[in-house]
Amino acid sequence: MTTRRRAAFGALQTKAGGRMNMDNEVSAGLAPFCMRVADLVVRIRPLHAMVGRLCKDYVVDASLAVDIEIGATQADIDYERDMATEGTDWTDAYLETLAVQRAIANRLPEQHRLLSHGAVIEFEGRAYLFTAPSGAGKSTHIRLWRQYLGDAVRVINGDKPFVRIPECREELPVVYGTPWAGKEGWQRNDSAPLAGIVLLSRSEPGASSIRPASAALNIDKLMRQVYFPPDAEASMLTLDLLDAMLARVPVYDLACDMSEDAVRASFEGLTGLDYHDYVRSASHED
């Protein structure tokens, strides 16, 4: 781990704090269910029906071998309420869905996986992760890709994808859809190899551009878009996984407005294809 990354990690850990207690209370009243997410079978002991409805696209046979077992307590729900910066009238049922997400995320590093904050699209079998602080325009940019490129673009997840980093250094990380998909609800139970990570920012109108970026020089930004568990060992493992991911996946800076030219810039920079040639070819095929 580089000195820069250790320093950024130390600052992040200082702010992290928190406590979670996900595994010591059995839910009453509702039957446990199993879901498959990021190629892991997770057994959930729900307190409220909402979490089951949220995960319905991922539910699998309960007889499968379980990789992770979790269940949120009322204390965990109260913790999520304390962590909320808005929406203090959220119900316990909704907050349980956040607590379950956090519980799974806390266990991902031991399975060579991590949770990222970003929107993921898949184009021709390769995934691209757009990440930025909330409100920077990720969803708008994804919506423009879908508007101008149609069914050739699939959204894997709009907010909280999981990423698996294979132990083999020759293999690309794989990004997965999850039920936690932001206010748009863009998600699918699918996966694709991760071919690019995009640091998105807004540009002046007509000034959209994309360029390769240094992962080392942008490590602070990248770390802020990855979930680090409160457990020190799991956090260190997450940092190792992030290092491994960045060693295999190129990073880009994208400055974009809300126009078709923003799609052209990011499309050409990420895929290496000529945007207008591709659009003409696709229209002829239709």
Language-model regions: role of each:
Residues 141-142:
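Post-Walker A alpha-helix
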Residues 23-32, 38-56, 63, 89-90, ...:
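Glycine-rich, often acidic-flanked micro-motifs
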Residues 134:
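The conserved Walker
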Residues 1-20:
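N-terminal amphipathic/basic-hydrophobic helices that include classical n-h-c signal peptides
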Residues 60-104, 270:
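Charged, amphipathic alpha-helical linker segments immediately N-terminal to NTP-binding catalytic cores
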Residues 11, 18-19, 72, 88, ...:
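Intrinsically disordered, low-complexity regions
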Residues 105-106, 112-114:
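N-terminal active-site beta-alpha-beta segment that forms phosphate/nucleotide-binding
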Residues 137:
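Conserved glycine(s) of the Walker
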